[in-house]
Amino acid sequence: MDKAEYQSRLEELNSLVKKEDYEGALAVVEAVDWRRVKSLRTLGMVADVYEANKRYPEAKKILLMAYDRSSIGKGILYRLVEVSVKMKDFDEAIDFYNEFEAVARHDNSRYLLKYKILRGQKAPLEEQISLLEEYKEREFTERWAYELANLYSKAGETQKCIDACDELILWFSEGKYVTKAMDLKMKYERCHRPSRSNTSIVLTTKRMKSHPRIRKHLKCG
């Protein structure tokens, strides 16, 4: 394949990925020999296409190629952990996690990676909850706050689930995970108890304001 043909294929691939037509993009991906490509962005996109089509071994192969071309590769290592978990290759997932931790010792996302490994291994809920609680102490984000609330629900910790939903709803106000939190909270309030009192909500707000990231945000405001 000459340079002009490769460029044409790459433009087609970019267009298909932008439209989220991953099935069509797969046909383009399989028509190109990616071993000569040096662009980490392009290799990452190719891995995205394979992953979207559940072709995890191929995605992993491309990510390893990208890792070989990268000076640090923190983001690539993160994805290698995720893909290895999806392949249920937990030994390799742990190896990649250890490499990630070595180059990103202070990156809070290491808690999420470890959680994803435990979740894939179907580890006890208490272990999964503990990791997400550690992450929440450092980062308060919608997706993982809801994930933690859902784990509390699965573990039968009803009050903790409701409190976690309240924090998420009060802080973020709207969005996909706020809606999910409202639905999860309502399930318990309909079945087990009346609505939370204003006093409970005030206490939840006070706990939120004590969170380091939220406190910093409030000071900046």
Explain the meaning of each model-derived region.
Residues 25, 59, 93, 127-128, ...:
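Single-residue signature of alpha-solenoid repeat helices
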Residues 44-51, 64-65, 75-140:
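Alpha-helical adaptor scaffolds
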Residues 7, 40-41, 74-75, 109, ...:
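Start-of-helix register in tetratricopeptide repeats
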Residues 69, 102-105, 156-177, 182-193, ...:
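TPR/TPR-like (Sel1-like) alpha-helical repeat modules
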